[in-house]
């Protein structure tokens, strides 16, 4: 194990270039940026915790939803990919029973006393609650974990739709797993992070984001039994054909007033399921659903029925997307991406709020995407919870400049992220 200064010198000399290239790509421009980024993180660690300490450096990726919009919470399928935007953490184990985490861009140093295992008053919805919950999740698995000091630098920006929270959680989890020799596998780490987010942070999240950051690559997940989801990893190499780039555009609208809108999707789907004797739509016979549409319209309303239609069709579509990726048929995959986007707009109705028709950033982004990409072999769709946030597009390289310029004209400079899929999940880098 090296000191932070030794690692900085090794990185500057290019000794870690092969490792960085495996994570981010091997172009000189990319490597120069990552050398600078890792060196800066190590320097900041020294600033906050002092020089001369032996450290290890970790990476946890963000993720993009590729299919299965609002299907996971109904015990359906999910499809997501890890991306090259990630959180980097420099960490050093300590023996004082405290976890200290300083994150770039945040003024506060999180200090967690591990003798205080229970959720603390006033801590929910803050990063400290995630750290405490993850540590307690390890202990619940019988792992004897202790303190560490860390500095994190995340390129997975908050609100970018790429799950900055899952990247942060997995960064903390991989540090504890490695520094204390716990030996837990990636799915177990993901479940610990979900436990922390649900129980300590106070957000009833699913598991797909954490699984994707933990495992890496493209994940197809069957949530029929959400306590033990079936996970299939599809290798990221070759998923995107030569000359095609994944773009995610942040429409820069706030989710702060949308909790009720998100809840309504789940509530309405489950109201339909209840009419058919199930708790969620994944427990319902689809054939019976179609047979009983008149009764369901009367009892649940048209929007609930349309959202249930979205679930059944999107679930089948997600399985077909998985099959297309395994077969290497990107053209078929792209057609399914478009259909997914149209279903979110027309049936799930989570592209804009009916109560606020003047504000339709996602609608505008999708319309411009269609005008540029239709007939080019590319594809576009909304991703994530909806109503605000981000859209996803697969853009031929010849159209990248035009596409990004159009998005930035609408939503401002820097709104369009050009991404690659990443094979590795959360890992110790050096």
What residue spans do the PLM features occupy?
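Glycine/serine-rich anion-binding loops at beta->alpha junctions
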Residues: 59-75, 155-172, 376-394
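Beta-strand segments within the central parallel beta-sheet cores of soluble alpha/beta enzyme folds
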Residues: 100-102, 147-154, 184-195, 334-339, ...
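Glycine- and acidic-rich phosphate- and metal-coordinating loops
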Residues: 135-157
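Structural signature of FAD isoalloxazine-binding scaffolds in flavoprotein oxidoreductases
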Residues: 76-96, 215
């Amino acid at each position: 194990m090296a000191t932070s200064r030794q690692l900085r010198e090794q990185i500057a000399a290019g000794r870690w270039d092969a490792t960085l290239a495996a994570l981010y790509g091997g172009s000189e421009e990319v490597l120069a940026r990552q050398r600078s980024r890792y060196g800066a993180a190590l320097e900041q660690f020294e600033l906050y915790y002092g020089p001369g300490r032996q450290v290890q450096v970790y990476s946890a990726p963000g993720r993009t939803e590729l299919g299965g919009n609002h299907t996971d919470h109904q015990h359906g399928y999910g499809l997501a990919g890890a991306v090259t935007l990630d959180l980097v953490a420099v960490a050093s184990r300590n023996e004082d029973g405290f976890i200290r985490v300083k994150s770039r861009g945040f003024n506060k140093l999180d200090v967690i006393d591990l003798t205080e295992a229970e959720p603390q008053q006033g801590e929910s919805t803050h990063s400290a609650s995630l750290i405490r919950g993850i540590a307690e999740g390890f202990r619940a698995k019988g792992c004897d974990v202790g303190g560490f000091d860390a500095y994190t630098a995340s390129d997975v920006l908050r609100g970018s739709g790429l799950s900055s929270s899952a990247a942060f959680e997995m960064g903390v989890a991989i540090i504890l797993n490695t520094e204390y020799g716990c030996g837990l596998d990636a799915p177990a780490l993901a479940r610990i992070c979900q436990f922390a987010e649900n129980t300590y942070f106070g957000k009833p999240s699913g598991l797909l984001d954490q699984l994707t950051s933990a495992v890496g690559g493209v994940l197809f997940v069957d949530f029929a039994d959400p306590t033990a989801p079936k996970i299939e990893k599809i290798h990221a190499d070759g998923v995107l054909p030569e000359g095609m780039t994944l773009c995610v555009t942040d429409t820069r609208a706030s989710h702060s007033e949308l909790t009720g809108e998100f809840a309504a999707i789940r509530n309405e789907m489950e109201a339909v399921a209840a009419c058919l004797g199930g708790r969620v739509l994944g427990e319902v016979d689809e054939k019976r659903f179609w047979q009983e549409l008149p009764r369901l319209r009367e009892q649940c309303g048209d929007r609930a029925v349309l959202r249930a239609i979205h679930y059944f069709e999107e679930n089948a579509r997600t399985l077909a997307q998985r099959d297309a990726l395994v077969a290497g048929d990107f053209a078929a995959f792209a057609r399914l991406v478009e259909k997914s986007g149209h279903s979110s707009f027309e049936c799930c109705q989570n592209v804009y709020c009916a109560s606020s028709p003047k504000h339709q950033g996602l609608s505008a982004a999708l319309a411009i995407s269609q005008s540029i990409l239709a007939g080019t072999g590319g594809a576009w769709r909304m991703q994530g919870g909806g109503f605000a946030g981000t859209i996803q597009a697969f853009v031929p390289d010849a159209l990248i400049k035009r596409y990004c310029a159009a998005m930035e004209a609408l939503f401002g400079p820097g709104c369009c992220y050009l991404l690659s899929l990443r094979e590795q999940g959360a890992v110790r880098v050096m």
